[in-house]
A protein has these predicted regions:
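Sec-dependent signal peptide recognition
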Residues: 2-9
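C-terminal motif of bacterial Sec signal peptides marking the signal peptidase cleavage site
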Residues: 14-17
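Bacterial signal peptide processing site
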Residues: 19-22
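Post-signal peptide N-terminal segment of mature Sec-exported envelope proteins
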Residues: 26-49
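Noncatalytic modules at the cell exterior or secretory-pathway interfaces
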Residues: 37-43, 90-100, 149-151
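Extracellular carbohydrate recognition and processing domains
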Residues: 63-91, 135-137, 144-147
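Extracellular beta-strand ligand-recognition surfaces/modules
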Residues: 82-108
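Short acidic/polar inter-strand loop motif in beta-rich domains
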Residues: 104-112, 117-125
């Protein structure tokens, strides 16, 4: 009788201890998912045949007062092929507006933007280069050529011009960023 009782007690102990471990594992997975760090990431697919430095400026105060305090730089290596540039925002950043600066090298060649993507957590906005001006204001000091067939935009460098090709967000981009950040 004692042996049967001890055996039954051991089986109960095993069954209940295994269930609590499964429950703890499920809780840990849920906790890890909710504690996953969300941060903004901007990606650009570009063709740049001269060395350059690109920047993404951002603000967190619903203005377009961009400063060097809120900027992410990315070195662009010269290549005739498409390269993807990643601009990873700080974890604490909560951008409301972004500005693209496509190079600070006055000796640069034309720049081709095939696409760009903004993502935050599991949400993203991806657009072809040819749709660039659906999201950004045109900068009259920079000439552009849009190739609808390729879905790209080319930013043309004027000889002797020292103008930096920078582009402010329009209302559509501001709304899209707000959707991403919710």
């Amino acid at each position: 009788m004692n042996n049967k009782f001890l055996s039954l007690l051991a089986v109960c102990f095993l069954v209940f201890s295994c269930k609590s471990e499964d429950k703890k594992t499920e809780e840990n997975v849920e906790s890890t998912e909710t504690n996953a760090v969300k941060k903004m990431l901007v990606q650009m697919d570009v063709i740049q045949t001269t060395a350059n430095n690109y920047a993404v400026y951002y603000t967190e105060d619903n203005t377009i007062n961009f400063t060097t305090e809120y900027v992410i730089w990315n070195e662009v290596k010269p290549s005739p092929n498409v390269q993807t540039l990643d601009f990873s925002f700080p974890e604490s950043a909560y951008p409301t507006h972004v500005r693209f600066d496509l190079g600070n090298n006055p000796q640069t060649d034309d720049v081709v933007l095939n696409k760009f993507k903004l993502s935050y957590g599991d949400k993203s906005l991806e657009a072809k280069g040819s749709d660039f001006f659906n999201y950004f204001l045109k900068n009259d000091s920079i000439a552009t050529e849009i190739d609808q067939a390729k879905g790209s935009i080319k930013f043309l460098k004027k000889k002797g011009s020292k103008a930096v090709p920078f582009f402010y967000p329009n209302e559509v981009m501001m709304l899209e960023i707000a959707k991403l950040m919710k």
